[in-house]
């Protein structure tokens, strides 16, 4: 056995607490220097080495977390559960308050478009004699949100592609900051800006659309040329409001495109646009769809901005250029101030429907995003 191999074999047995062979001699240069400094024989025998060197005590591995870890875990768990508890309490409250209305109105609550409370002989609202229907508001909610998605999502995805693959670093940093600030703007600011700035511009474009595309049913004007404060204007405002959401999500997903796939596309002679179309788009498709669904949920639940730029009318309006429409959230805001105690319960029922719609849309969006992340990992 060579000296080097004997040294390592002896060191291994020593570390394990095993007996060393009597012929083993520790010839480490460091050990010899230390022995000479102490006036000892540099050729240390195995018995002397094993008796003079204190082996480290065996370490115990414990799985019990420390107190600080347990406290932190409890705080984080409590914070996560509190959001679910609050969400559940809101759902229970809306269901409890709106139960009588839903029971009395039945399917008419979802198919009717008339909102009129009838007072009974006792001075209270008679739910059976009253007419509470949100069909017009439900359709208006879907129309405004759809317009917002059709206009806002292409702009947001294009912006995210530019910021990820084309923009210089300085421009990217500034644009990301502005987009993040837009996401934090209050809704009333968007509403006021839409009313004073976007509405006149939207009326001009609505007239052009009606002039050249009035053969399409949704662009016709059956009730006269009332272009002001139409669902198109509300959809434009909502499009501006959802652009930051879709842009941020899409930009993060495009930035996660694997570098090896990008380099492989370039190595095959592809241009940057070919790489984006054949590599980045397929990779980020599910995430972009999930971000779009989240933006759709935001657009469906928007209240103040829509209320500011849209004429609230209780009739089903499929003509997006006509200045009449509404959504569930703006209807609740409009009626809540003058509502009686019983009518408030009807508004709670409308809020329950809106809550369920946004919850379903957001759940689908989270499912799509999670599946996209798992698929990429």
Region locations from a protein language model:
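C-terminal transmembrane helix and the adjacent membrane-cytosol boundary/short C-terminal tail
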Residues: 251-255, 259, 266, 334-377
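Transmembrane alpha-helices
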Residues: 178-181, 185, 189, 246-253, ...
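Periplasmic/extracellular loop-to-transmembrane helix junction in inner-membrane transport proteins
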Residues: 58-70, 74-75, 95-148, 168, ...
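Transmembrane alpha-helical segments of polytopic membrane transport and secretion proteins
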Residues: 3-8, 13-16, 22-80, 365-377
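Transmembrane-helix boundary motif in ABC transporter permease subunits
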Residues: 148-179, 365-371
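Hydrophobic alpha-helical transmembrane segments of multipass integral membrane proteins
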Residues: 135, 139, 143-151, 155, ...
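Glycine-rich helix-loop "coupling/hinge" segments at transmembrane-helix boundaries
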Residues: 296-341
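Membrane-interfacial helix termini and adjacent extracytoplasmic/periplasmic loops
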Residues: 104-135, 190-240, 320-322
